[in-house]
């Protein structure tokens, strides 16, 4: 039996939503082991002087806990 956990992260990009997603997943996998999936919970843009200056995504990252860490949920 495996147990998964979900954590929410926020990522930004000056290029696009796709770049914000890629950057967020890349950063999450540097410190979270066993990442299995991610879904975009929210998307936002920041506008200055009538132009988009930043894309932001909130991602829900799902990862499977190591056997030794499953007690952490108790």
Model-derived regions: residue spans:
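Short, well-ordered alpha-helical segments
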Residues: 2-36
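Flexible glycine-/small-residue-rich
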Residues: 11-13, 42, 59, 63-65
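Short, conserved loop-to-beta-strand elements that form functional interface hotspots
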Residues: 38-47
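C-terminal structural segments of small proteins and small subunits
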Residues: 51-74
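Residue-identity detector for glutamine
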Residues: 22, 43-44, 56, 70
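Noncatalytic linker/hinge segments flanking ATPase motor cores
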Residues: 21-24, 47-52
